[in-house]
């Protein structure tokens, strides 16, 4: 009987020793936004609470400044 081993989650920001998450770093932010435009929760990504709060604020700022979309492209 084969056992399924779940990969260990780790905080990417802690591993890379990031001090603050920048709202202008769109490549990083896009990795934490789902296909539908929702912010992916930390229980799925493994991000620590401190960085999850910074991430949410940065994504919301980028959305407000029209750097990121609020939703998906609606089937375009």
From Swiss-Prot:
Q: Which Pfam families does this one have? A: Ribosomal_S18
- Keywords assigned by UniProt, alphabetized: Ribonucleoprotein, Ribosomal protein, RNA-binding, rRNA-binding
- Output the InterPro entries linked to this UniProt entry: Ribosomal_bS18, Ribosomal_bS18_CS, Ribosomal_bS18_sf
The record ties this protein, via Gene3D superfamilies, to: Ribosomal protein S18
GO term, biological process aspect, one: translation
Q: What PROSITE patterns does the record point to?
A: RIBOSOMAL_S18
What's a single GO MF annotation on this record? small ribosomal subunit rRNA binding
The domain of life for this entry's organism is Bacteria
Annotated GO CC locations? cytosolic small ribosomal subunit
Q: SUPFAM superfamilies recorded for this chain?
A: Ribosomal protein S18
Give the protein family: Belongs to the bacterial ribosomal protein bS18 family.
**What's the subunit arrangement here?**
Part of the 30S ribosomal subunit. Forms a tight heterodimer with protein bS6.
Role: Binds as a heterodimer with protein bS6 to the central domain of the 16S rRNA, where it helps stabilize the platform of the 30S subunit.
Its recorded name reads Small ribosomal subunit protein bS18
Q: Which organism is it from?
A: Pseudomonas putida (strain ATCC 47054 / DSM 6125 / CFBP 8728 / NCIMB 11950 / KT2440)
């Amino acid at each position: 009987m084969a056992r399924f081993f779940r990969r260990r989650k780790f905080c990417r920001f802690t591993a890379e020793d990031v001090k603050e998450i920048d709202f202008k770093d769109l490549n990083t932010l896009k990795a934490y936004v789902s296909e539908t435009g929702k912010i992916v929760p930390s229980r799925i990504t493994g991000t620590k609470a401190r960085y999850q709060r910074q991430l949410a604020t940065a994504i919301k700022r980028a959305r407000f400044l029209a750097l990121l979309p609020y939703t998906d492209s609606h089937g375009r």
